A protein has these predicted regions:
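Conserved non-cysteine loop/helix-boundary elements of the Radical SAM core domain that shape
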Residues: 73-99, 105-202
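Short beta-strand motif preference
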Residues: 55-57, 169
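Structural signature of beta-strand start/N-cap positions in the alpha/beta core
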Residues: 53-54, 104-106
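Short glycine/proline-enriched loop/turn "hinge" motifs that connect secondary-structure elements
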Residues: 48-49, 58-60, 100-101, 197-200
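Flexible, acidic/Gly-rich N-terminal and inter-domain linker regions that tether
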Residues: 1-54
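Divalent metal-dependent hydrolysis catalytic cores, especially in the metallo-beta-lactamase
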Residues: 54, 67, 142
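A short secondary-structure junction motif
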Residues: 28-32, 65, 74-75
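Local cysteine-cluster metal-coordination motifs and their immediate loop/turn environment
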Residues: 57-73
Length: 202
């Protein structure tokens, strides 16, 4: 292909040629403001009482910084910080869950950060807290993001026993040079072992 054959859509380039937030959530970060107070929150909660709930739990912790990562994160190897975070999360859940009484959870997703930063006891603690405060549909999708650098095979068994039935694995790239450049080096064989074990346990 010669340079003359390349079509440049200048309008499209100009439309997106600026720094802005990545689309990682809805509403996007720019939609949040101090103007959205408690009363507005309560009105939003009451707006669709017949709809099932989709819950997202953010686990911000990582053992190591990935250079490409733009979401909220705390890079630490101090495991007790996760316990402190779960303490705060418990207060928020106990305070807010009654607002959703009578509504069933059809989806739960743990994202991060690195949700598998949590140890087995912490995973069980959080799942128990969620089940005690929300009503889950029998066929609810319960998913988690898995970092293959931050998990052992037996943790998959623990996640399955806790009710997780879906996972997404953050491999990002198999190219070793790319992995080095983004500070996310990982064992390819172990990734496939994780995938195979996940299939085995359903």
């Amino acid at each position: 292909m010669s340079v003359q054959q390349i079509y440049w859509d200048l309008a499209l380039i100009q439309k997106y040629n600026y720094s802005g937030p990545r689309y990682t959530s809805y509403p996007t970060a720019l939609e949040f403001s101090e103007d959205f107070g408690e009363q507005a929150f309560l009105q939003a909660v009451a707006r669709y009482p017949e709809r099932p709930l989709s819950l997202y739990v953010h686990i911000p912790f990582c053992h190591k910084l990935c250079y490409f990562f733009g979401c909220n994160k705390i890079v630490t190897r101090q495991q007790h910080k996760a316990d402190q975070y779960l303490d705060a999360l418990e207060q928020e859940i106990v305070h807010r869950a009654p607002l959703f009484a009578g509504r069933h959870v059809s989806q739960l997703h743990w994202g991060g950060g690195t949700p598998t930063y949590l140890n087995k006891a912490q995973i069980s603690r959080l799942m128990k807290l969620l089940r005690e405060n929300f009503q889950f549909n029998a066929d609810a999708e319960i998913s988690i993001e898995v970092d293959p650098r931050e998990i052992e095979l037996d943790v998959l068994d623990h996640l399955r026993a806790e009710g997780f039935n879906r996972l997404s694995m953050g491999v990002q790239d198999f190219n070793k040079e790319v992995q080095r450049l983004v500070n996310r080096e990982q064992d390819e064989e172990f990734i496939f072992a994780l995938l195979n074990h996940a299939r085995e346990i359903g």
